[in-house]
């Protein structure tokens, strides 16, 4: 409680409604071109969340666990949580899985933007908690941080919170999700010469690829589909990967994420070709197949959204009103069973799961 009072006092910005509306419009127009700038989404959520947050507050005031959360105002910050201790917990506990997720994707709850524009301290706390709990939602629903997985989680959050900004994310996500994604998966570490011009970017048994689902290998011709003329160049694939890594944090150039897979040591890569305004992926020149192919946009619309809707309505309590910190040392499956949470189905795990 004490920590959040200080956070609230140091972060609240008191501006009039006209200024809030101006900020809202500016952030909405900038979110699409810069989706990686999460503070823009947070500001838009702050300004548009008034009535939804008030409804959440009214619900939590009538719930025993919610009352305790509002009174104590726990936070996922170093002052309240000993994160290093969570790493020492048994591997199937919620706390261990949470830390594994954060370290895999280089995240921290501290990175979540606090509420700035909500005057009521309880309502401001609810919105801040919702953002901090977001990463735990990834863990309990077993969703990675790809665009399609984030969109599925936003649908769950929309049903549980009714926050308008989640609806915006759900509507925009299909337009930002790649049409195709091909994955290049290593069982252990990435070869040291992976970004060297002479690296052979083809399916090679020496690298011990994982094929967990025994999926059919696909023939795919880069030049025929993407009209790329330069792939015969010895340095083409090197330039392709170099461009991807150089622009990884520039969402206007690269739409997508690195997904860490098997044992948190794999790279599954996509590349956005700015010149052709299309997505480019590895072509196997020797065996004429990719290791794994799927269609993220189709997956989102036909599989992830239906699953997210179903699991959200059957979950018996929204995450923000659960004292999840008290569950860190307990089995994650018991947590899911207690609140009737259905994680991502195993058949979708390789595409959108944490693995």
UniProtKB/Swiss-Prot annotation:
Its EC number is 4.1.1.130. InterPro entries: Coq4, Coq4_euk. Pfam families: Coq4. Keywords: Lyase, Membrane, Metal-binding, Mitochondrion, Mitochondrion inner membrane, Ubiquinone biosynthesis, Zinc. The keyword Zinc applies. GO terms for cellular component: extrinsic component of mitochondrial inner membrane. Component of a multi-subunit COQ enzyme complex. PANTHER family: UBIQUINONE BIOSYNTHESIS PROTEIN, UBIQUINONE BIOSYNTHESIS PROTEIN COQ4 HOMOLOG, MITOCHONDRIAL. This is Ubiquinone biosynthesis protein COQ4 homolog, mitochondrial.
